[in-house]
């Protein structure tokens, strides 16, 4: 019995010691930045948004497709995702686990994929522009040991397929 208790304590200590290097801390950092820097009525879209939402203290649209509407799924699968999120007031997109070129800031545009939850439909995407980044978090280590980073962009207000609008300073 004592051996089992010691094993449980060691396992817990090992888990806790890795928390500082994971998405949990990255999402908290980004959420706190949002709470301090974005207007109270700002709406942010994000996948895996639970921890981030708690600390952001703002409306967050879940972009996983798991806890959203059938209308959202249809928009993702039909190439109308940007129009959908804009119509629902989303102004910012937050994404973790971005590719290396995005982590390095070596990109002009990044097409963030969103899986189609409908049978046979193509995946959707949002095209995010480097010049519209508003937050770049501290790099963190994922559970599988890769370095990741959470980035937030202002969403381009131009409807899909049209030239970007001037976003000002």
Spell out what each predicted region is.
Residues 1-12:
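Signature aromatic-anchored transmembrane alpha helix within multi-pass, membrane-resident enzymes
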Residues 14-38, 43-158:
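Extracytoplasmic
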Residues 157-167:
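Short, charged low-complexity linker/loop segments at the C-terminal edge of domains
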């Amino acid at each position: 019995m004592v051996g089992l208790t010691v094993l449980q304590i060691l396992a817990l200590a090992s888990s806790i010691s890795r928390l500082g290097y994971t998405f949990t801390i990255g999402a908290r950092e980004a959420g706190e930045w949002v709470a301090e820097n974005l207007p109270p009525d700002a709406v942010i879209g994000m996948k895996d948004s639970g921890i981030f939402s708690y600390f952001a203290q703002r409306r967050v649209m879940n972009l996983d497709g798991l806890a959203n509407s059938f209308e959202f799924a249809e928009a993702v699968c039909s190439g109308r995702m940007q129009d959908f999120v804009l119509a629902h007031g989303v102004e910012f997109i937050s994404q973790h686990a971005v590719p290396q070129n995005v982590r390095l800031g070596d990109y002009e545009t990044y097409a963030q994929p969103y899986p189609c939850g409908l049978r046979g439909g193509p995946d959707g995407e949002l095209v995010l522009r480097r010049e519209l980044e508003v937050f770049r978090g501290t790099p963190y280590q994922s559970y599988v040991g890769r370095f990741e980073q959470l980035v937030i962009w202002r969403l381009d207000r131009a409807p899909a397929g049209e030239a970007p609008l001037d976003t000002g300073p």
